[in-house]
């Protein structure tokens, strides 16, 4: 493939932006080489500035669940912008969005719109601290909840990709208020609550880890956390920025039958535009200003164009059978990848929940951060580039989940698996 235009743009970008990108994982530092620059996207495909086409399993890191540039979403945006881009005042679309979320998500009786997943998680933590009068939070190794200071302790996503345990610039005192557990560790969670349970404001968790690749919870684990939080008076927060409306219509909480106190959203509810939200029970949410004393605000929150895009996307995922078909397609992909690896003699396992999947270069089932980081990253990197050269774009890190959309039909999956058979053979040469 020719990448001359992408190379020129990346060289220019490195003089203008830190690392040449606006989010670290995009720089390809984990996998090596240089990123391609996207010109446009459609359905299951990305097209770069050099004219190359890629089957896309990143999907803008999750929100493109109906494929890129879906006509219904695009048309909703086109209609909305005729009325203006931003009002800084209430609009009908944000009321409709709130009604939709509260109708579909078990934990949400009220919801507040924000502008990103990071903003949603920061706001949820502030609410939890204000509502409980406590300061400590509990998170999990490899889980990423945005770049707020409290979360950059043994975080996933770009932090894990770069091998940084805790970011410089995070005050030690703030880090000391964040306790970290191993995901899927029942005994560790119990022991921690026995020790500091009375000080914990909230437990925040990705119910399916999507930022240390894709790691589902063991049976009963989320319920165990729910029980501990209830017993000790702490709030349980599900970060459903990735899982919300993707693994099931009601998110991971509906899929696993465990209801948190607060839920954070992003990605899909903006249809690809910058949006976030957090929601929970009425008694908690009415403590947020102006209804209550816990302050949170945002000029662009509830932006009418973003609301229009998100509502169109949520309408699509409510179609009968949408999530069942998405899960079937993802299973077909994962089974095919494992078969192709096995035939080539490459140790690979996969995890899948709905339309999310993880590809691990190991012969062991991966259930936590430590196991994810023990996988063969060198072989993954070679596989990544072999796939990219054949026009298949996986996340440029061994520690990021993959995403399938409804635009990934059987022909797209078969083309992916044909490329994988070649790529697995390449890494064994």
Curated annotation (Swiss-Prot):
Subunit structure: Homodimer.
Record-level GO BP terms: protoporphyrinogen IX biosynthetic process
UniProt main location, coarse: cytoplasm
Name of protein: Glutamate-1-semialdehyde 2,1-aminomutase
Species, as recorded: Xanthomonas campestris pv. campestris (strain ATCC 33913 / DSM 3586 / NCPPB 528 / LMG 568 / P 25)
Any one GO molecular-function label of the UniProt entry: transaminase activity
Subcellular location: Cytoplasm
Family assignment from sequence similarity: Belongs to the class-III pyridoxal-phosphate-dependent aminotransferase family. HemL subfamily.
Keywords on record: Cytoplasm, Isomerase, Porphyrin biosynthesis, Pyridoxal phosphate
Catalytic activity of the protein: (S)-4-amino-5-oxopentanoate = 5-aminolevulinate
Entry-linked InterPro entries: 4pyrrol_synth_GluAld_NH2Trfase, Aminotrans_3, Aminotrans_3_PPA_site, PyrdxlP-dep_Trfase, PyrdxlP-dep_Trfase_major, PyrdxlP-dep_Trfase_small
């Amino acid at each position: 493939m020719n990448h001359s235009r992408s190379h020129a743009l990346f060289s220019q970008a490195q003089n203008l932006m830190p690392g040449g990108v606006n989010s670290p994982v995009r720089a390809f530092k984990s996998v090596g080489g240089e990123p391609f620059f996207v010109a446009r996207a459609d359905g299951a495909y990305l097209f770069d500035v050099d004219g190359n086409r890629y089957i896309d399993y990143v999907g803008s890191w999750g929100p493109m669940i109906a494929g890129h540039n879906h006509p219904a979403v695009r048309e909703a945006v086109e209609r909305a912008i005729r009325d203006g881009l931003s009002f800084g005042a209430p609009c009908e679309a944000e009321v409709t969005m709130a009604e939709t979320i509260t109708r579909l998500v078990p934990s949400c009786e009220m919801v507040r719109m924000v502008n990103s997943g990071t903003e949603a998680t920061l706001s949820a933590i502030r609410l939890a601290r204000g509502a409980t009068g406590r300061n400590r939070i509990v998170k999990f190794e490899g889980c990423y909840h945005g770049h707020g200071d409290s979360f950059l302790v043994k975080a996933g996503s770009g932090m894990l990709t770069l091998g940084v345990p805790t970011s410089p610039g995070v005050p030690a005192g703030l880090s000391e208020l964040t306790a970290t557990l191993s995901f899927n560790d029942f005994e560790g969670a119990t022991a921690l609550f026995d020790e500091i349970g009375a000080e914990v404001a909230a437990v925040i968790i990705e119910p399916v880890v999507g930022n240390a690749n894709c790691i589902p919870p063991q049976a009963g684990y989320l319920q165990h956390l729910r029980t501990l939080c209830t017993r000790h008076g702490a709030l349980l927060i599900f970060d459903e920025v990735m899982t919300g409306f993707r693994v099931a219509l009601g998110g991971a909480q509906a899929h696993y039958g465990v209801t948190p106190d607060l839920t954070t959203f992003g990605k899909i509810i903006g249809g690809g535009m910058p949006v976030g939200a957090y929601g929970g029970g009425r008694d908690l949410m009415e403590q947020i200003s102006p209804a209550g004393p816990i302050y949170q605000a945002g000029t662009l929150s509830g932006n009418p164009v973003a609301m229009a895009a998100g509502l169109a996307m949520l309408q699509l995922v409510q179609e009968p059978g949408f999530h069942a078909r998405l899960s079937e397609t993802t299973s077909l992909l994962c089974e095919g990848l494992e078969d192709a690896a096995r035939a080539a003699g490459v140790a690979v396992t996969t995890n899948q929940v709905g339309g999310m999947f993880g590809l691990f270069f190991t012969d062991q089932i991966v259930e936590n951060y430590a196991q994810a980081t023990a996988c063969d990253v060198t072989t993954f990197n070679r596989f990544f580039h072999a796939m990219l050269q054949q026009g298949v774009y996986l996340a440029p890190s061994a520690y990021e989940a993959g995403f399938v959309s409804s635009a990934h039909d059987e022909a797209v999956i078969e083309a992916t698996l044909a490329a994988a058979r070649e790529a697995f053979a390449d890494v064994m040469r």
